[in-house]
Structure formats: structure tokens, C-alpha cells
């Protein structure tokens, strides 16, 4: 039993360190889906992952003096329902920033 393209759902997962760049990418994807008459739901914000690194400030003995750095990974999900072939072509040709990681599932 095969499902036609009109009944499928495209799930797009986006990850980035910069929240503003991620939101701009989400807006571009939703705008592209709207221009090709596909319905888009999202962006749905997922929990932000924080990775904290502890580094000694001194190269020698002062272990009491430490510095903390963190990276935050912001994540979003966009679901596109009833995509057409035109929608998929437009999403493939979309120019997004290099700092945004994209995963697409059909």
C-alpha cells in the first residue's frame, strides 16, 4: 500500500547555535511552503541543550581559579503537510545559512 504525495508529511528539524539565524531560516521555510500552497505547522521550539566546559585559568597550579564556557544548541521542528512536487523542489533550492543544521524526513 503506497501513500500518495498529498497525504505525506515532511518533518524538518533545525539546529543552530545562533537563535536569530535559526528563526530566520524557519521563516524562509514557512514562507516557501506557503507560496507553494502547502500547509506548514511550526516552528515548534524544542528544549535548548547547554554544554558547559570548565577550564583552568592558570597553566600551572592555581586550581581554584577556573573559567566556565557554554555552548547552547537551539532546536526547532517544522511539519509540512500535503506537499506537492513543487514544494519539494522549492525547499531543495532554498538558500539557508551555513550555521543551521537541517534534517529532513519524509
Curated annotation (Swiss-Prot):
A Pfam family recorded for this sequence: Ribosomal_S10
Cellular compartments per GO CC: ribonucleoprotein complex; ribosome
What molecular function terms (GO) are annotated for this protein?
structural constituent of ribosome; tRNA binding
Task: State the superkingdom.
Answer: Bacteria
Among SMART domains, the record links this protein to: Ribosomal_S10
One GO BP on record is: translation
Entry keyword set: Ribonucleoprotein, Ribosomal protein
NCBIfam families this protein is in?
A: PRK00596.1, rpsJ_bact
What is the role of the protein in this entry?
Answer: Involved in the binding of tRNA to the ribosomes.
As for family, the record states: Belongs to the universal ribosomal protein uS10 family.
| Assembly and binders | Part of the 30S ribosomal subunit.
Q: What is this protein called?
A: Small ribosomal subunit protein uS10
Organism field = Prochlorococcus marinus (strain MIT 9515)
Gene name linked to the record: rpsJ
Amino acid at each position: 500500500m503506497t501513500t500518495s504525495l498529498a497525504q505525506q508529511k515532511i518533518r524538518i528539524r533545525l539546529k543552530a547555535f545562533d537563535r536569530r539565524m535559526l528563526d530566520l531560516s524557519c521563516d524562509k521555510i514557512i514562507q516557501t511552503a506557503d507560496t507553494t500552497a502547502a500547509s506548514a505547522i511550526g516552528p515548534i521550539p524544542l528544549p535548548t541543550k547547554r554544554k558547559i566546559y570548565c577550564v583552568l585559568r592558570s597553566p600551572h597550579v592555581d586550581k581554584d581559579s577556573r573559567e566556565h564556557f557554554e555552548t547552547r544548541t537551539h532546536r526547532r521542528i517544522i511539519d509540512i503537510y500535503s506537499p506537492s512536487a513543487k514544494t519539494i523542489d522549492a525547499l531543495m533550492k532554498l538558500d539557508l545559512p551555513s550555521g543551521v543544521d537541517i534534517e529532513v524526513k519524509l
